[in-house]
């Protein structure tokens, strides 16, 4: 298992980055906020999960180790594959996911595209006894984020990458300005999730 990967960003898209390590470029799928924070020719380190299929090997990467662990945990629920797990981690972080499941908050889970009431209830039932494993450790990959561009631009780029129009993305960014002002240290990932929640209303 590849649990951690570091390299120089050689390319990036809405939901992926290519990290060059000694001349070998590895494509890593990641949440839009993470991809938006990537800057060409800058170093990036991600906590990763390798998904093995008969015809493919896919590497998913996360800034926080807890989010990587949550990505793997939700896939133990029936009907949840890597793509849906990645969608979940694009909207909720590990702590928010654990809280939603523990408190049986299906409304929060339903904010994730692809999860309905029945699916949320099923996830809660199957994962409620497992979420204790998501206790925050405060461990983040060294050098994983490089805020070279304004946070507004990064969040907007991430939303557009998810399919929202530029206009909707800008409106969503405007709605989270107060959060950033109240907590200047708030991460791009958390701002992205807040913006997504405002769009889901």
From Swiss-Prot:
Domain of life: Bacteria
Entry-linked HAMAP family: DNA_HJ_migration_RuvA
Subunit-structure text: Homotetramer. Forms an RuvA(8)-RuvB(12)-Holliday junction (HJ) complex. HJ DNA is sandwiched between 2 RuvA tetramers; dsDNA enters through RuvA and exits via RuvB. An RuvB hexamer assembles on each DNA strand where it exits the tetramer. Each RuvB hexamer is contacted by two RuvA subunits (via domain III) on 2 adjacent RuvB subunits; this complex drives branch migration. In the full resolvosome a probable DNA-RuvA(4)-RuvB(12)-RuvC(2) complex forms which resolves the HJ.
Keywords per UniProt: Cytoplasm, DNA damage, DNA recombination, DNA repair, DNA-binding
Organism this protein belongs to: Cutibacterium acnes (strain DSM 16379 / KPA171202)
Region: Domain II, residue numbers: 64-142
Lineage: Bacteria, Bacillati, Actinomycetota, Actinomycetes, Propionibacteriales
Molecular-function GO terms, alphabetical: ATP binding; four-way junction DNA binding; four-way junction helicase activity
Record-given protein name: Holliday junction branch migration complex subunit RuvA
């Amino acid at each position: 298992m590849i649990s951690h990967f570091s390299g120089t960003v050689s390319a990036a898209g809405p939901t992926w980055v290519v990290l060059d390590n000694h001349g070998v470029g590895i494509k890593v799928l990641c949440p839009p906020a993470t991809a938006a924070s990537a800057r060409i020719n800058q170093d990036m380190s991600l906590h990763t999960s390798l998904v093995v299929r008969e015809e493919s090997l896919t590497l998913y990467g996360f800034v926080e180790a807890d989010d990587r662990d949550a990505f793997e945990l939700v896939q133990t629920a029936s009907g949840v594959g890597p793509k849906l797990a990645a969608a979940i981690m694009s909207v909720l972080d590990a702590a928010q996911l654990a809280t939603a499941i523990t408190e049986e908050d299906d409304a929060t889970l339903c904010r994730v595209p692809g999860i309905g009431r029945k699916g949320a209830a099923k996830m809660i039932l199957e994962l409620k006894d497992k979420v204790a494993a998501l206790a925050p450790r405060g461990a983040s990959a060294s050098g994983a984020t490089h805020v070279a561009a304004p946070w507004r631009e990064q969040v907007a780029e991430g939303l557009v990458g998810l399919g929202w129009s530029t206009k909707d993305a800008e409106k969503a960014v405007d709605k989270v300005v107060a959060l950033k002002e109240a907590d200047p240290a708030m991460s791009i990932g958390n701002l992205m999730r807040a913006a997504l929640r405002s769009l889901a209303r």
